[in-house]
Design a protein with these regions (language model features):
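Extracellular and analogous surface-interaction loops
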Residues: 2-10, 60-67, 370-374, 423
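Surface-exposed beta-strand/loop patches in noncatalytic accessory domains
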Residues: 18-57, 400-402
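Short acidic/polar inter-strand loop motif in beta-rich domains
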Residues: 20-22, 36, 58, 76-83, ...
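Beta-sandwich interaction modules
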Residues: 45-67, 77, 417-421
């Protein structure tokens, strides 16, 4: 069955259905490209399949989508002499290979409930520099994607982003493995790596010409080219560069229209001079609304839970309308994120700290912005679900006069309400909990208040 592929197509998806299966009718499918070459053959095994330059449904080979006449290959190995079958094929053209442009038939929803979901936004497999022990522990090898995902499931993560350095080759593995791993969302991603800094692009599949990153203007233009469809966060912004960590220091500057987030903790560097917390807070004070995130930057899934940069620690709790790629990316961009630095392996249902603000009949979640008249009362509600006594700290700009003793103890499961008057300028508040040794265990993103 011929069909005409226009120019500018980044992905082809074919959805088929046919009648007569109760009478043992079988229809097989395959695909032939514009050059009359076989792209793949799935027989009667798959009724929906997709391909792009970077990934394809198993049975099909990834390839660039050239314009011209393609053919849906149809075989009928069995149909009874007196039977008829109605065949319908829907063909979808996407402008790019990225998930944001995929048709709904490809959308994976692991959980349809609106709730907090926990995951790791920075990890590597053998598609870049991730390694692990071989099957018989004879040597270290590029780590297979499935092994990283298995460890993420073992750690009870709801989602995992594999962010490989300047390559998207893992996309084909994720396309194959996502149906099997039906209780964890696999996010496509890239660690865009240059001598001017590293940045994660969550939701990116298409190639980015990292050679353009050899100049700073090229680096920024590459970030801007993808920023509308993905979540871009600066990685380890104050990490030293040079031989210590090539290109790790952020030199991209701010304001930067391509960036929506800052990785304020990479591995276990929260509380060290390499943490990006102060870097992020200074940007808040300058008026930049950027989501704080964290990432393990794991390069070996075999690491013990208490090792540096072990998979799933630190983690990000994301309040999303469902557990799908589009919903997680949307919530990351909106700042609905709590960062968890604790070493509590049992925490799988809710973040250690939650915060909402009530302004009249309006309720603001973490990451939300609200217009508030001068002098209006804001009720700030903070709840901890931790199993141990903790200390609460609140942070805001100088205009927000919060009558609260920072470091006050919180009992397990305690909820407190703090009343605040809207000051004469726009403000924000974020919260953190620490242990008795003042180690940061969790922190929220801000709620923003704009003077009405």
């Amino acid at each position: 069955m011929p069909f005409d592929v226009p120019s500018g197509v980044g992905r082809i998806t074919i959805e088929t259905e046919y009648t007569g299966q109760s009478e043992r009718t079988v229809v097989d499918f395959g695909l032939i490209d514009h050059a009359d070459k076989l792209v793949g053959w799935s027989g009667g095994n798959k009724k929906t399949f997709t391909l792009s330059e970077f990934d394809a449904t198993p049975s099909y080979s990834p390839r660039g989508i050239s314009p011209g006449i393609w053919h849906l290959l149809i075989g009928v190995p069995n149909i009874r002499p007196d039977s008829t079958s109605l065949l319908k094929a829907k063909i979808y053209f996407s402008k790019s290979a990225d998930p944001i442009d995929e048709p709904g038939v490809l959308r994976t929803v692991i959980n349809s409930r609106t709730q907090w979901y926990r995951g790791d936004l920075h990890a590597h497999s053998g598609h870049s520099d991730g390694t692990c022990a071989s099957a018989h522990h004879k040597l270290m090898v590029p780590c297979p994607t499935y092994k990283v995902i298995e460890k993420a499931r073992e750690r009870k993560l709801d989602f995992l982003a594999l962010t490989e350095h300047n390559t998207g080759s893992q996309a084909n593995s994720l396309r194959e493995l996502q149906p099997f791993f039906d209780d964890i969302l696999l996010l496509s991603g890239r660690e865009l790596t240059s001598f001017y800094g590293h940045a994660n692009a969550i939701g990116l599949v298409q190639n980015i010409d990292f050679q353009a990153n050899s100049a700073q203007d090229g680096w920024n233009s590459q970030l801007i080219s993808v920023s509308n469809s993905v979540f871009v966060s600066v990685n380890h912004p104050v990490r030293p560069g040079g031989e210590f960590c090539m290109g790790c220091a952020w030199l991209g500057g701010f304001p930067n229209p391509a960036v929506q987030g800052i990785e304020i903790a990479n591995g276990d560097d929260m509380g060290t001079r390499y943490s990006g917390l102060d870097f992020w807070e200074k940007l808040l004070e300058l008026g930049h609304k950027l989501t704080a995130v964290a990432g393990s930057d794991n390069h070996n899934p075999d690491k013990d839970w208490y090792d540096w940069s072990t998979l799933g620690r630190p983690s990000n709790w994301v309040l999303a309308e469902d557990l799908s790629q589009s919903a997680i990316i949307k919530s990351l961009r909106q700042g609905h994120v709590v960062l968890d630095f604790s070493k509590d392996e049992s925490r799988i249902h809710q973040p250690p700290i939650e915060m909402i603000a009530k302004v009249g009949d309006q309720v603001a979640q973490i990451g939300d912005s609200r217009l508030v008249p001068l002098g209006q009362t804001i009720d700030l509600e903070i709840t901890t679900s931790d199993n141990y006594p903790r200390r609460l700290f609140l942070h805001s700009n100088e205009a927000m006069n919060i009558q609260y003793p920072n470091g006050r103890g919180l009992s397990p499961g305690e909820k407190i309400i703090i009343k605040i008057k809207m000051p004469n300028e726009s403000s924000w508040i974020w919260a953190e909990i620490r242990d008795e040794k003042k180690n940061v265990l969790a922190l929220t993103n801000p709620i923003y208040f704009t003077l009405k």
